[in-house]
Amino acid sequence: MLKKAYIEITNRCNLHCTFCPGTRREKQFMTVEAFSSLLPKLRPWTDYLYVYLHVMGEPLSHPQLAELLSLAAARERKVCITTNGTLLARQTETLLAAPTLHKVSVSLHSFEGNDGAQEREREYLDAVWAFADRAATRGVIVALRLWNEGGAETRNGAIEAFLHEKCPGEWPEPRGGS
């Protein structure tokens, strides 16, 4: 049985990250009709499913995001979204109004991957944190992600300092892995 399915609701992105392979496909948004017809096709594979609205593209840029979230709720699907975080302030109310929203993962390294100016970095991080704080009070999981190596990681120290400011105290050592 499946536990999750990835649905690419758009392959359009508002950024051009240096670490993203991108796509040569025509840029488009999935229609509400296509999304609506896809959800019941997943039913035979599971009784409970997390729907991840991300493959390529920035899901928060979808002009009908609220409708897609409503359709997922009607089909009792929990929604997980991965975002670059730049549109969170604009979509906060839509996201937090969705009872089906389970998790939002924010790729904090996206800002640096777009030659993000250091003077705008604090504004970006503050907006992400404001969303994360509100979402957490509603029981939504928020994961703040950073590249460890091989990507846009030169600003990780500054981002970690920001996070330590927001979450003071001892932090466990990062997990290693292969």
Predicted regions and their residues:
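Conserved alpha-helical substructure of the radical SAM core
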Residues: M1-K103, N114-R122
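Radical SAM enzyme [4Fe-4S]-AdoMet core and its adjacent flexible, acidic
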Residues: M30, R75-K78, A97-S178
